[in-house]
Amino acid sequence: MTDRTYPDDRAGSFPSPPATFTDGEDREIRVHESGPEESDALVEMYEAFDPADRAQGIPAVDTEAIREWVDTILSGDSVSVVATHDGRVGHAILVPDRAEGYELAIFILAEYQGAGIGTELLARLLGQGQEAGVEHVWLTVERWNDAAIALYRKVGFETSNSESFELEMSIRI
């Protein structure tokens, strides 16, 4: 058990994948469920990340470390969705922790940020999580990452711990 807290009320229902939408840059984006079969494509996407855009040390920089990380997070009971437009441009995942919750991670390639892809990808991930029986989701985000914090609050995350240099946020789905 952990002393992590979650909101008392559920955030509501979220749409599940698949979905196709037009982003803020007029690009057609497809969101679909992903799993281990996406490993090679996701490694390729994560290799394209600028080291300066990495948060909390992930994704790794070295290809083998990226592959090991991707294989680890895609195994077991994780819930994962991917956004595509001429290849993989975003990935969001819920990874079960040792307690009752799932940790959320979301990554969007820099040239696709700020166009609404993160919002759609996050909503579809939470919808897929609801279908899989996930109830508690948490994440950590760097305090200076205002765009990410605004996105998480927009879909219903609440700050559950603000005692360190990172914020911990949680949602009940």
Locations of regions flagged by a protein language model:
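Conserved acetyl-CoA pyrophosphate-binding loop and the N-cap/start of the following alpha-helix
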Residues: 112, 116-124
